[in-house]
Regions:
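A short acidic, Gly/Pro-enriched loop at the edge of an enzyme's catalytic core
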Residues: 283-294
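Class I SAM-dependent methyltransferase SAM/SAH-binding core
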Residues: 224-226, 232-284
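Conserved Class I S-adenosyl-L-methionine
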Residues: 365, 378-442
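Conserved catalytic/acceptor-binding region of the Class I
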Residues: 322-391
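A short glycine-rich, Lys/Arg-flanked "PGG" loop and its adjoining helix->strand segment in the class I
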Residues: 307-322
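Catalytic active-site module of serine/aspartate enzymes centered on a nucleophile-bearing elbow/loop
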Residues: 95-138
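Conserved HGGG/HGGXW glycine-rich cap/lid loop of the alpha/beta-hydrolase fold
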Residues: 151-192, 205, 239, 303
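Conserved alpha-helix/loop element of class I SAM-dependent methyltransferases that forms part
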Residues: 205-223, 238
């Protein structure tokens, strides 16, 4: 029998459903890594599926005719979904008007009524025999197979998988949904953005980049460290172990969902006293001026007002302290090691082929200019590639999930054949380009 740590997501979900006595349920989610295994391997438990801002034609055939996709009506994500859905039968598509959805958008809070109405109208179609039946589950919380759950309401079970990086997650929708359905909201380190952040933060190729950043920041024993946008806390925990308690470490994030998971994971690893997690906005940090010797941030500046965030980071850094920032790089190509035709390889390795950046965010070499304009000196500029191989399946699945929906069927087949060949030879990897900068506050 597989250990819990080795369980696939679909096996974890199946154990959870058995524990709750649920044979069949409606599901709603975002990331394919959360729902694809269940849909393809255990389709009999899926009464219907609602996807938010995503579509992957590789996995949806088992739910044809009972699939709803909700997107905005503008922006690259909506266009990618439209292209991926083209020619696929049995899919209902609802577009939220005048809306561009990013991974960090507060979709359930900003479009509560439209989002709720779309879900309820779709779910109302599945009340005939054979759909998910009402289950008398008591309201409460628990954890099974590494997945946390919270139950609200009475009715047919509706399993709510994490909404990527959305701060509010499903909370604004729960009151209305739980009037008609037994909502089962899921979390934990095995699902959603937390699973990706944790896997990425343990990958050798990624940690080498972060380790290089810390070394260039010249962190010394006794210095106070702030991580802005700490997410699940995976890097804060890594730093706490690396420094063995020699530094006061604080993590701040605006996302309550990620902060809850960060505190839980730190407690599970016995690091709850080594790291302080705080709620706070990167554009208005809740700390006094000159509070930390080192202020760092990793792949957050793409999602904020970049210049305002840098100004805040400098403000809370002590004179002589260092500010260290990593941004995803949409202006650098991303090499992939597998035998593809030259034209196809050039297409998918081109700068900016995948990735997101907000209107005021920074995901290019302007990071170095911005850091200097923020008043930092002795700026070190470190463009780097983080590589992920077969030892990093969760990150590879995420990167592949961003790539494949932008390809046509012939290209997908070529990719899958080439990947299988490269994996058989043990040479497959994908890369994620970044810009890294370290500067000193005068």
């Amino acid at each position: 029998m597989a250990t819990e740590a080795a369980l696939a997501v679909e096996d974890r979900l199946h154990r959870l459903l058995r524990h709750l006595g649920v044979d069949q349920a409606h599901f709603a989610g975002w990331l394919a890594q959360d729902w694809s295994g269940l849909v393809t391997k255990c389709p009999q438990v899926v009464s219907s599926l609602i996807l938010v801002n995503t579509f992957d034609r590789r996995f949806v055939e088992p739910v044809s005719g009972k699939l709803l996709v909700i997107t905005g009506d503008r922006g690259p994500a909506a266009e990618k979904v439209r292209n991926a859905m083209r020619g696929v039968p049995g899919v209902q598509h609802v577009e939220l008007s005048d809306y561009d959805i990013f991974p960090w958008s507060v979709i359930a809070g900003e479009r509560t009524r439209e989002f709720t109405d779309a879900m309820l109208e779709f779910l109302s179609r599945f009340t005939a025999p054979g759909s998910a039946n009402s289950v008398p589950l008591p309201e409460g919380e628990g954890k099974v197979a590494g997945i946390s759950y919270r139950i609200r309401g009475v009715g047919p079970p509706l399993v709510l998988l994490p909404l990527f990086l959305t701060p509010s997650q499903w909370e604004p929708l729960i009151p209305a949904l739980s009037e008609r359905y037994c909502t089962i909201t899921l979390g934990g380190a095995a699902l959603g953005a937390v699973a990706i952040l944790e896997a990425r933060g343990h990958a050798i190729g990624y940690l080498e980049m972060v380790r290089n950043l810390i070394e260039k920041a010249d962190l010394r024993s006794g210095e106070a460290v702030l991580e802005v946008g700490c997410g699940s806390g995976v890097l804060a925990r890594w730093l706490a172990r690396r420094t063995a308690g020699g530094n006061r470490i604080t993590g701040v994030d605006i996302n309550p969902y990620l902060l809850r998971e960060a505190k839980t994971l730190a407690r599970q690893e016995g690091l709850e006293t080594a790291i302080e997690f705080r709620d706070g906005n990167a554009e208005a940090l809740p700390f006094a001026d000159n509070s930390f010797e080192v202020v760092m941030s990793v792949t957050v500046i793409e999602e904020t007002d970049a210049d305002q965030m840098l100004a805040e980071m400098v403000l809370v850094t002590k004179p002589g302290g260092r500010v260290a920032v990593i941004a995803r790089a949409l202006d650098i190509g991303s090499p992939k090691n597998l035998p593809l035709s030259a034209g196809f390889k050039a297409k998918i390795e081109a700068p900016g082929f995948t990735g997101d950046v907000s209107s005021r965010g920074c995901a290019d070499a302007s990071l170095y200019r911005r850091v200097q304009q923020a008043g930092l000196t002795q700026v070190k500029m470190l463009p780097q590639l983080a590589a992920f191989d077969q030892a990093d399946p969760t990150v590879l699945q995420f990167l592949e999930g961003a790539l494949l929906p932008k390809l046509n069927e012939e290209e997908v087949r070529e990719w899958q054949t080439a990947r299988a060949e490269a994996e058989a030879m043990g040479i497959f990897y994908m890369t994620w380009p970044h810009h890294c900068a370290v500067g000193t506050k005068p």
